[in-house]
Amino acid sequence: MPRDREYDQWGYSGTRRDGGGRYGYRDRSRDERDRFRDVRDRDRDRDRDRERDRGGYRQDPRDRRYSRSRERERRGSGSRDRSRDRSRDRSRDAHRPPPSGRPHQPSGHDSTKSSNSMSETSSTSQVTGTTPNTTNATPSQAEIDAKKAAKLAKVAEWKRKKELERSKSASASPAPSTAPASPKAGFSMSGLSGLRKATDQGQVKRKMFFGGDSDEEDAGRKPAKLLKKLGEKEGSGKSEGKGRGGSQSEAKNASEKNGAASEPAEVDPLDAYMSSLTLPTTTSVSIADSTPLENLNVWEQVDTLEKSQDPTLDLSALSKRKEIAIVDHSKQVYEDFRRQFYVESSELADMTEAETNELRLSLDGIKIRGKDCPKPISKWTQLGLPGPTMGVLNDLRYDKPTSIQAQAIPAVMSGRDVISVAKTGSGKTLAFLLPMLRHIKHRVGVETHTTTLSGASSHPLGVIITPTRELCVQIYRDLRPFLAALELTAVCAYGGSPIKDQIAALKKGTHIIVCTPGRMIDLLAANQGRVLSLSRVTFLVIDEADRMFDMGFEPQVLKLTQSIRPDRQTVLFSATFPKKMEQLARRVLSKRSSDSLGPIEIIVGARSVVASEITQFVEVFQNEKSKFPRLLEVLGKYFAQGFFDEQSEGRVGTGESAATPIPNPKCLIFVERQESADSLLKELIQSGYPCLSIHGGKEQADRDQAISDFKSGLVSVLIATSVAARGLDVKGLGLVVNWDSPNHMEDYVHRVGRTGRAGQKGTALTFLLSDQERLAAEISRAIKSSGNAPPAPVQLMTERFEFKVRSGTEKRHMYGFSGKGLERLQDERDATREHERRAYEGDEAGEAETESSTPAASTANTDIIPKPVIVVTPPDSKSPTTAYHTTLQINDFPQQARYRASSNTSVSRVIANTGCSITAKGEYYPPGRIPGPKDEPKLFILIEGTSERAVKLAHHELSELLVSGLVKGARYQV
């Protein structure tokens, strides 16, 4: 119904009481409703504001006129009102008298005006010699002045008492020397005459106390303001300390000034209290008195430069360094432990010396070096092992011991230090696990406090050290069945996995730890050595000992062995053990004065020999492209038949091969570089072969998963670098392919030893290029050591190489086990240190005194990189993007620096910034090696761009990345 008719029905339309006509009452009623609504809304808005101030504002569902957009505008307008209120309050506060105890601080636009007025007032007072007129002051101002005077009197009285107490304490102490004190670099709050004005390292360290960079900036700003005030009062001509009279005269002068000046300068009680305190002094070390960098070694140079850049590193440097505390064994009290657990059976005791030699000859020609070596066994029952251990051996179907087990287990159980060398796949792991378990089980039973895994039992009794992570995991898996039967525990610790999980496992308690050297050092250095201790270790095993030293682990291994008690039992196992490595490995053997027999060396077969169960093939190719079609042909035959064998020119020997098909056959392909592994993986996947790859550039979780999938049969082809050449045992692995030939004989033996294990047949195929004569000579040595003749093409390449060596055109570079990891280790360190020394010599003396957060390596050390030479590409270039190009040599820099400059992340960022094309080319050459005329050049980065400016910019950014990696590359990585 229309609104007018509604009013007519109620009788409001016919009366003209106010002269408004027909709609007069309606208008009046509407005005009343609007007035009521305004009042209601005002009250509601007031309630809403109250709720909002309390933090509990919530939209009223009954308020239909609520709108989020209008509410947002209302709040926004409120912020503008608050801004206007602040400006209004600021102008009001400018004319308000200062509060008691605080001098007036003019702010903003009126600072100039107030300062001018103050200067005029003070000058007038000085000229006339009279006080300013204060008769016009209001009563409130007079009250404020009276309060100020009373407060100053209290301050003067308080200071007088403090000075009296100080004089009493000074009289009780010895009288100081009458000689004037020299200014100190450090300072206290009671005396400031010795303060330095110049910026030095002392002031840099002082920032740690007085803030500026900390979160509590107000707390740091307060002492700074206090220093400024006290410095103005003290002056340079006054002495540091004041007596009682000085304090009273100072208070008197302050009170007189307060009565004479219109703006009295008074002392706040908090400031006065702070002035009585003495902050800890710091000693400033000048740059001139510090030790020059050239007198320090590389590691001290890096630490010194980093500390000068950031003073906070002084506090945390010790906690970040992975150092193991040196143990003084002469001051330690160790408990005696039992070593002898082997009792010769009557059956072996009745054997004569001739029968013993005949038995050793039948067991793959065992050779013994050492005194009083036990006789080899022929059955497990002759060892006297515990019942649970025998049960596990029966469950695993280990019918009888292998050659190395028959001789090594009795020797180790006799308590002797043993060096064992045996071919791959001969059961070396079980040869040291069984004696270790027998040794530790006895100690757990004897030591009552180790029966429960708590307290001191978190420290292991036995340690197994391996060179690679994959071997560490495999030994731990072989150990687990025996742990459950004997009620023992073990922890597997290796790099690439979270260390917190391994620390948690150690805290629960462990008897055996299987580890890599780097992670063991991490655990020993964690929490200042409170996480793990090797003081209770009495049985030490180093598996693949030769590779441990060859990979450069000698310093780490020596550190670990130094932390273990010297009368321990040490056992070394490996498949290859050159005499030079043997001399170095003997350094870790224990030197017991009570043991005059010395260690026992057991050699099964030759020192570096390929097992007779492996059929070897070596094929020579003219170029790299012809290798992949041959690989596809071999894989096709292998997976179709279950084995691979053919009468070809590259076959080694004429013996029988693996003619029996293998169920679920698997193939392992070895490459030399990580890039080769990734590229070959893509090509095989495109050809229809599902495969995986592992190398040192992958995460440890990915490597573990790849090996697990390969063992379970999810994939049949695995591509790997030499990280899988040691200890990897896979059932059904019947074919090993060396896509890239190994560079030394021992690596070849370990690679092909992944097949033909535990008496099974296997095949090994090696690809050689026609110009790889040096590698052919190494493979020829390995084949001859196994009692076979190398193929004719390989023998021809070997003869050519020997002729070049005799004529002097080639040098016989010995790789790997003849000194790769040890003889060149010091040369590589010296070369790295030389680069770092040159890098840090570029800094000027004045630059060390400046405060900078930029690393030194990225600011002034780019002088070691030559200036870019921009070359213009000929006009007939294939692409216009390569009109200009230059090169950046990275071969001679440390590995960390090379990685920083050539990683995908760094290259992508430089490409995005400059638009240049960046490619890594060449081949890495170790220090001291020079590429020949036909060899690839040293490793470098090719930079190509459309303009000279872009190429220079890309070269500059890559140079900074390269040099910034020197500091990290100089750090000791474990």
UniProtKB/Swiss-Prot annotation:
Q: Motif DEAD box at which residues? A: 543-546
* Cystine residue pairs: none
Which residues bind ATP per the record? A422, K423, T424, G425, S426, G427, K428, T429
Where is this protein found?
Nucleus
The alphabetical list of record keywords is:
ATP-binding, Helicase, Hydrolase, mRNA processing, mRNA splicing, Nucleotide-binding, Nucleus
Q: Which GO terms describe its cellular component?
A: nucleus
Comment field on protein domains: The Q motif is unique to and characteristic of the DEAD box family of RNA helicases and controls ATP binding and hydrolysis.
Name this protein carries in UniProt: Pre-mRNA-processing ATP-dependent RNA helicase PRP5
